[in-house]
């Protein structure tokens, strides 16, 4: 199979990158006002037998208070993947609101067996009209 002429005409972008070369590490979670526990299932695993990133995000969202989930939509997500999780690991999803309006939360996912932090994240929520 030959590469088509359209692809051959493509040129790399020059100048500044869209994303910075290095991303800042999010702060740790000092206070845990909302928590939920999960056990890693087979359906949470990718082909390498690690928990996939979709499961991590689902667990973070599940730790957000129901009153926020019922009245808002996830508008922004910033996430740092720090370590891997595996089948049958017990994971604690914890979060704490950054502001009094509950529009932003800091999150942490921790493997309970050894206390290893797996993920840090920040979510921003927008009220449903």
Predicted features along the sequence, with ranges:
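Extended serine/threonine-enriched, polar tracts that run as long, contiguous segments within proteins
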Residues: 62, 76, 80-87, 92
């Amino acid at each position: 199979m030959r590469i088509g002429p359209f692809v051959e005409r493509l040129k790399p972008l020059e100048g500044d990158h869209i994303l910075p070369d290095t991303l800042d590490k999010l702060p740790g979670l000092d206070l845990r006002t909302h928590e939920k526990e999960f056990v890693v299932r087979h359906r949470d695993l990718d082909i390498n037998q690690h928990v996939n990133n979709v499961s991590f995000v689902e667990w973070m969202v599940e730790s957000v208070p129901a009153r926020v989930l019922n009245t808002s939509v996830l508008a922004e997500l910033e996430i740092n993947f720090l370590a891997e999780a595996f089948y049958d690991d017990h994971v604690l999803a914890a979060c704490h609101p950054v502001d009094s309006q509950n529009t932003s939360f800091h999150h942490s996912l921790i493997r309970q067996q050894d206390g290893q932090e797996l993920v840090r994240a920040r979510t921003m929520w927008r009220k449903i009209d």
